[in-house]
């Protein structure tokens, strides 16, 4: 069998994942406004795809052509563009369908041509009061450098200023970062109707207010467009320059990085399209997409709650972990010292972690706090706690990952603020991104230092903890806390040798240990012992690990995969992956936690990890996976995994055809895993 048939290209697999998101927008069992929000998620995902995956492919094509190599990448480019075009057509159809369904529910997203006289007057006042100060036209002249001026993934209106036979062009930025994208209009009869208008259409309606008095014209026509840039960096790590200075420079470079996608309104005149293409230096390798009237659908993620309560998801109140509320514990440290605690977001509240760090910031017994941050919330209480701890005389070390894609600017801000507060801030070594989710609190108890550790699968972020599924393990077990201490030492001194007996740490030992554990399952299967591998991942694309799973399947090891995003492995290939079952779940929460389970001859090993099975995570990042040593917590994770694999509502097969077929229910009971997990955890947190 040829090599190309053993793996799905990661770019196509990623697009298949985003098509699953689009399926959620099409799913009529989802509430109407949630379906509209899934359109926003799809659009946001696609923007990131072009910034990262597509841009990387474009670079590969340019390099391969310079070297005179084969055309595989160009062929893949064609497949991508074809698949995106098909999905975009489905997207447009779904959007129109949802608009009709909204109207049936008395929610009207109207355009500038559908305004009543009263609404027209109201809009002109709104424009002058809230919007005009944010609008400055960019005139397109022969020397205008649009690549320099235009912002990445912002929607613009390209305006024709027509005077007789002369046409001038200008661009208007739609300032959705300063003014709400959705604006509620005064209702008309009947009063139950809820009219809204997009910011784009307010600008269309108010073109005269923008240009009148400055230009003579017979007509003004506006067409939407946006441009997506390559999000990668070209960092040259000079010894005398700090990483923060380099990152600030690279952020400036991103503002002028090469465009990789140009999306424009389908009825934009050809002459204007050509002017924009030329000004944006769009090459034959870039994606040029004629689209609808609106771009930046990512704002639809925040489509407002309007109308009846059943148009949005029924709330699932976040649950407190009952162990922290027991009367005998004076604080969170007492509870964790008694036994390990496992939190599973967003079912559990993130408040427990925030509260523990708040307590640590002023507890007289706390000596030191170490934490690494990758993506934190905009108004991060964790950052506040670290600053308060430093003010209270604690020794605070914060490892800031300046290379967290799309969060670099925020992390530079946090690093400066922490440094000013007296916190010891350190950065990752060049080329070694820190993706682990750790903190370590050192506390003086009865004359000895006791350490408390957090190992997680997700970021210390209050916002995403309400949307992403992730685990937090809180432990005072010295077997784990001593090794977390070693991880922080490794971060500060990445080239000193370090060993671990319990933790799986990239790039130190992850690949070796994963290979060894898969090989052990193969040996057990061959000897007739219990064997099996179950993985829950965001992405599975490392060919070495995929090949190891193929070898396991060929040896009779049952392999169960739950992969949300990219999966290069192809299940059910005869003689290669017959024993591999792979599914994906897309639902109201984003499945983000990573779990590795090995049967281990009947004594299961269960790991929680920050690392996907991607080459970068295994070999080029600092990642941490922890074993669950407490049998109670191990069983809890196994129960949750069982629920996920029993899903008969939101589970899809991963297959060679990228079909996204739903797993058939057959005669099994209806199980929507995320709701079932909520009920399971709720049952565990009942008072005894």
UniProtKB/Swiss-Prot annotation:
Membrane topology: Peripheral membrane protein
Gene Ontology CC terms, in alphabetical order: cytosol; membrane; periplasmic side of cell outer membrane; plasma membrane; polyphosphate kinase complex
Record-level GO BP terms: polyphosphate biosynthetic process
CDD domains: PLDc_EcPPK1_C2_like (cd09167), PLDc_PPK1_C1 (cd09114)
Active site: 435 (phosphohistidine intermediate)
GO MF entries: ATP binding; diphosphotransferase activity; metal ion binding; phosphotransferase activity, phosphate group as acceptor; polyphosphate kinase activity; polyphosphate:AMP phosphotransferase activity; protein homodimerization activity
Binding site for ATP: 45, 468, 564, 592
Residues of the PLD phosphodiesterase domain: 430-464
Main location group: membrane
Subcellular location: Cell membrane
Domain of life assignment: Bacteria
Enzyme Commission code: 2.7.4.1
Keywords for this protein: ATP-binding, Cell membrane, Kinase, Magnesium, Membrane, Metal-binding, Nucleotide-binding, Phosphoprotein, Transferase
Function of the protein: Catalyzes the reversible transfer of the terminal phosphate of ATP to form a long-chain polyphosphate (polyP). Can form linear polymers of orthophosphate with chain lengths up to 1000 or more. Can use GTP instead of ATP, but the efficiency of GTP is 5% that of ATP. Also exhibits several other enzymatic activities, which include: ATP synthesis from polyP in the presence of excess ADP, general nucleoside-diphosphate kinase activity, linear guanosine 5'-tetraphosphate (ppppG) synthesis and autophosphorylation.
Record note on quaternary structure: Homotetramer. Dimer of dimers. The diverse functions of this enzyme involve different subunit organizations and conformations.
Record family assignment: Belongs to the polyphosphate kinase 1 (PPK1) family.
Descriptive protein name: Polyphosphate kinase
Name of the gene: ppk
């Amino acid at each position: 069998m040829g090599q190309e048939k053993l793996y799905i290209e990661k770019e196509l697999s990623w697009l298949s994942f985003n098509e699953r998101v689009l399926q959620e927008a099409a799913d009529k069992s989802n509430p109407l406004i949630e379906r509209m929000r899934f359109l926003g998620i799809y659009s946001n995902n696609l923007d990131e795809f072009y910034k990262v995956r597509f841009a990387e492919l474009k670079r590969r094509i340019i390099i391969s052509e310079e070297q005179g190599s084969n055309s595989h990448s160009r062929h893949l480019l064609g497949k991508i563009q074809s698949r995106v075009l098909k999905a975009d057509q489905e997207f447009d159809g779904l959007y129109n369908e949802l608009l009709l369904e909204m109207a049936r529910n008395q929610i009207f997203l109207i355009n500038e041509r559908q305004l009543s006289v009263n609404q027209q007057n109201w809009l002109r006042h709104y424009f002058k009061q809230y919007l005009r100060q944010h609008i400055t036209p960019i005139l397109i002249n022969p020397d205008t450098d649009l690549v320099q001026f235009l912002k990445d993934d912002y929607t613009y209106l390209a305006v024709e200023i027509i005077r007789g036979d002369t046409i001038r062009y200008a661009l208007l930025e739609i300032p959705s970062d300063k003014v709400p994208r959705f604006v509620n209009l005064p209702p008309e009869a009947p009063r139950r109707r809820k009219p809204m208008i997009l910011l784009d259409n307010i600008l269309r309606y108010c073109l005269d207010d923008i240009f009148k008095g400055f230009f003579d014209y017979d007509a003004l026509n506006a067409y939407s467009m946006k441009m997506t840039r390559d999000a990668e960096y070209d960092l040259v790590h000079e010894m005398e320059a700090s990483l923060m200075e380099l990152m600030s420079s690279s952020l400036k470079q991103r503002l002028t990085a090469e465009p990789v996608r140009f999306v424009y309104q389908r009825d934009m005149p050809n002459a204007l399209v050509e002017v924009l293409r030329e000004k944006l230096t769009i090459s034959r390798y870039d994606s040029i997409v004629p689209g609808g009237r609106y771009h930046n659908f990512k704002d639809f993620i925040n489509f407002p709650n309007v109308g009846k309560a059943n148009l949005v998801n029924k709330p699932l109140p976040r649950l407190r972990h009952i162990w922290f509320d027991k009367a005998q514990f004076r604080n969170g440290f007492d509870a964790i010292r008694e036994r390990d605690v496992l939190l599973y977001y967003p079912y559990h509240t993130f408040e427990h972690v925030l509260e523990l760090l708040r307590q640590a910031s002023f507890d007289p017994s706390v000596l030191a706090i170490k934490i690494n941050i990758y993506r934190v919330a905009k108004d991060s209480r964790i950052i506040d706690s670290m600053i308060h701890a430093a003010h209270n005389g604690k020794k605070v070390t914060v490892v800031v990952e300046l290379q967290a894609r799309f969060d670099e600017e925020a992390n530079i801000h946090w690093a400066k603020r922490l440094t000013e507060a007296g916190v010891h801030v350190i950065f990752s070594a060049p080329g070694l991104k820190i993706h682990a989710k750790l903190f370590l609190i050192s506390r003086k108890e009865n004359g000895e230092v006791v350490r408390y550790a957090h190992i997680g699968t997700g970021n210390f972020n209050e916002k995403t903890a309400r949307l992403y599924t992730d685990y937090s393990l809180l432990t005072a077990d010295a077997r784990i806390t001593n090794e977390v201490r070693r991880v922080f030492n490794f971060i500060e001194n990445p080239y000193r040798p370090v060993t671990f007996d319990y933790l799986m740490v990239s790039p130190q030992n992850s690949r070796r240990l994963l290979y060894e554990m898969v090989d052990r399952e193969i040996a057990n299967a061959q000897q007739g012992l219990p064997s099996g591998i179950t993985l829950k991942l965001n992405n599975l694309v490392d060919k070495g690990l995929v090949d190891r799973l193929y070898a396991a399947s060929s040896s009779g090891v049952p392999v169960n995969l739950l992969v949300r995003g990219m999966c290069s492995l192809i299940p059910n290939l005869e003689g290669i992956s017959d024993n591999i079952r792979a599914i994906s779940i897309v639902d109201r929460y984003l499945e983000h936690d990573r779990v590795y389970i090995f049967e281990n001859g009947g004594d299961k090993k269960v790991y929680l990890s920050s690392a996907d099975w991607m080459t970068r995570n295994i070999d080029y990042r600092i990642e941490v996976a922890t074993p669950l040593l407490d049998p109670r917590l191990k069983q809890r994770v196994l129960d949750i995994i069982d629920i996920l694999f029993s899903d008969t509502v939101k589970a899809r097969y991963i297959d060679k055809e990228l079909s996204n077929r739903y797993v058939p229910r057959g005669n099994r009971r209806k199980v929507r895993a995320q709701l079932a997990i909520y009920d399971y955890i709720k049952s565990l947190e009942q008072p005894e």
